[in-house]
A protein has these predicted regions:
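Short polar/charged helix/loop
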Residues: 2-136
Length: 136
């Protein structure tokens, strides 16, 4: 484990769920976590509804872009969070994996995407609290 935990979020397209999780954890962790994201079949662009919802929250996802999933992403991680990539996500026996069952925001209206991002937000906050451990 490094000084900063490494947490990649993995999904199929790296345009919605994993993007939202990365942006949210980056925001809440304020540099205390090395946050990454990738997709097993990366999209060519970000999900516009997810971008809109994150922007509504005062976050800037515009520096992000869909990235391909590599074995190195998993090997460098302390905790890997998967979101629907199933068997296409690489697994390293030395790494802890957490699977988050979440609706894919692709093609969903912004009202539905808000609920998905709310759920991701709740899980990201819980993960950050777990990574921080008990207060000294």
């Amino acid at each position: 484990m490094t000084d900063r935990p490494v947490v990649p979020f993995l999904c199929v397209h790296n345009a919605g769920r994993s993007l939202a999780a990365k942006v949210l954890l980056d925001h809440y962790a304020a540099g205390a976590v090395d946050v990454r994201s990738a997709g097993s079949e990366p999209a060519t662009s970000l999900n516009p509804a997810v971008v809109d919802v994150l922007t509504e929250r005062g976050l800037d996802p515009t520096r992000e872009f869909p990235k391909p999933l590599t074995d190195e992403v998993a090997r460098a991680a302390d905790v890997v969070v998967t979101m629907g990539c199933g068997d296409t996500c690489p697994e390293d026996p030395e790494t802890r994996y957490v699977g988050w069952e979440l609706t894919d925001p692709a093609g969903q209206p912004v009202e539905v995407v808000r609920g998905i991002v709310d759920e991701i937000d709740t899980r990201v906050r819980a993960l950050l609290a777990e990574l921080a451990g008990p207060a000294a």
